[in-house]
Regions:
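ATP-dependent carboxylate-amine ligase catalytic core
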Residues: 2-24, 30-121, 125, 129-156, ...
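Structural motif
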Residues: 12, 94-96, 126, 158, ...
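Beta-strand->loop->alpha-helix junctions that form or flank phosphate-binding loops
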Residues: 44-45, 182-190, 306-314
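Intrinsically disordered, low-complexity terminal tails and inter-domain linkers enriched
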Residues: 85-91, 243-278
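C-terminal and late-domain segments of enzyme folds
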Residues: 118, 276, 290-308, 319, ...
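Internal gly/pro-rich beta-alpha loop/helix module
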Residues: 135-258
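Phosphate-binding active sites in nucleotide-utilizing proteins
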Residues: 279-342, 346-351
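Cysteine-nucleophile active-site neighborhood
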Residues: 332-402
Length: 469
């Protein structure tokens, strides 16, 4: 583990509430700074999968999440240092917040909030402020945000949706009164929007050409409206990052010895797992299954697996030699017909007798049908879209042994979906939380709606590779 201090410039992009323009500014900053020739490390507070996709496109390296609830507060700074080091050391890290600056896990007094993460990584905050229908009161709002928690340093403001030059002058003068510098101003007419869906933005993988255009437009916008030198000065005011870098090899305790070979798969120059002689773990990817944390593949590789992505929309079969399968989240409901049309892969997954781990979208895909379209039939359930959004952090207890859990273990995860399954859980459920059973353990299959970040549960990766024996 690296343990010496690293003077990593870093800044947290936050807001008083959702909808103020954090993603616009953070993504634009990443793209604009990269155009300057800087190596930029992108990060996102919270469990969200979609924003990091845009961040990664803008920065040219994977977007990574920093979530104290999912991984534990002690791992947040090490994960930042790891992400900013792979595949090469970054010149600056940009961390987009979640919701409002002080909004975190319900009833936990700001735990897992953007403010909490800002203190854990000792980074200054750049506050994005929607100024629609606001004048001098904007300064009072910023003053309150700054004073609410004295450990959080609000180092500057970017004014968003400014109505006119006169409006901008009024806002700048008011913020000067409270001693908070304005580092940029974006007019209402200059806004750039990315298409949205019921769970947020449309993932990058589903609209690659359009996503490139949106990210380029955001970089143009920020370069034209934000004082990038002032933002860099703010980021450089962060003290050295003294936390040791998170190490996937140390987290899993080294490679597992298996019949198919036990050498560690390692990591390529691009940050992905290298292909070696370890057991092949197939990981669903493509437009329908975009929800995955970068550390999942790193942990599997460190445990000795060869990680092989496959696209259930296009690939007629699992990668050669597959010993285990991981199917994460995404939007299968938007691709149900195309998934149904790949009958050969559905049949192979239905008959696959190795360990399978599925989260949310993966759960739906393993069922008999989704909104009437045939799926794999590996699990005896049907699924359908509803108008109700189920979301939030969960504290769960494993209800049974499985390829990745042991009965009685406690984990922290999150749910985020608008679908339901019938039945809601199997005879042997995967989890128990909120006084109810959830998910399915069926033979060597573990499937549920719960998303878990494996950096907080590294034994899951090790166990899955062990289950390949």
């Amino acid at each position: 583990m690296v343990s010496t201090g690293w003077a990593l410039p870093r800044v947290v992009v936050a807001a008083p509430a959702s909808g103020h323009g954090k993603t616009t500014v953070a993504t634009g900053l990443l793209g604009a700074l990269r155009r300057r020739g800087l190596t930029v490390s992108p990060h996102k507070v919270g469990p969200d999968y979609i924003d990091p996709g845009y961040h990664g496109l803008a920065a040219g390296r994977p977007g990574r999440n920093l979530d104290p609830w999912l991984v534990g507060p002690e791992r947040v700074a090490p994960l930042l240092r790891h992400g900013a080091s792979v595949p090469t050391p970054a010149d600056v890290a940009v961390i987009e917040g979640v919701m409002g600056l002080h909004d975190g896990a319900v009833g936990r007094r700001g735990y897992a909030s953007t403010a909490h993460v800002a203190t854990l990584v000792d980074a200054p905050v750049l506050l994005v402020l929607d100024t629609t229908a606001q004048g001098r009161s904007a300064a009072a709002l910023v003053l309150g945000m700054r004073a609410f928690d004295e450990r959080v340093r609000v180092g500057g403001v970017i004014l968003n949706r400014v109505g006119s030059p006169r409006h901008e002058t009024l806002l700048r003068d008011a913020l000067a009164e409270v001693g908070v510098p304005v580092l940029g101003a974006v007019s209402r007419s200059a806004e750039v929007a990315a298409p949205s869906r019921h769970l947020g933005l449309v993932p990058v993988a589903e609209r690659a050409p359009e996503s490139l255009a949106v990210v380029a437009a955001l970089a143009d916008l920020v370069a034209a409206t934000v004082d990038l030198d002032a933002v860099l000065d703010l980021a450089r005011s962060a003290p050295p990052l003294t936390a040791p870098a998170w190490d996937p090899l140390a987290a899993v305790g080294g490679p597992v010895s298996t019949a198919a070979g036990g050498g560690p798969a390692g990591v390529t120059a691009g940050g992905g797992p290298a292909r070696t002689g370890g057991p092949t773990v197939a990981v669903a990817a493509g437009a329908a299954f975009t929800f995955s944390y970068a550390e999942t593949a790193e942990l599997l590789a460190a445990a000795g697996a060869t990680v092989a992505p496959f696209d259930p929309l296009r690939d007629p079969g699992l990668p050669a030699g597959t010993r285990a399968v991981v199917i994460g989240g995404g939007f299968p409901e938007a691709h149900a017909d195309a998934l149904a049309g790949n009958a050969a892969l559905r049949a192979e997954l239905a008959a696959f007798d190795g360990p399978v781990v599925a989260e949310c979208a993966g759960l739906l895909y393993l069922g008999r049908s989704l909104d009437g379209a045939p799926m794999c039939g590996r699990l005896d359930l049907t699924a359908r879209m509803t108008g109700r959004l189920t979301l939030g952090y969960r504290e769960a207890v494993a209800a049974a042994d499985s390829p990745v859990t042991r009965a009685g273990e406690r984990v922290r995860g999150h749910e985020f979906h608008r679908t339901v399954t019938d039945p809601g859980h199997g005879d042997t459920p995967a989890w128990r939380f909120d006084g109810a059973a959830h998910g399915f353990v069926d033979g060597r299959v573990h499937a549920s709606y719960l998303h878990v970040h494996w950096a907080g549960q590294p034994h899951a990766a090790r166990r899955l590779v062990q289950a390949c024996r």
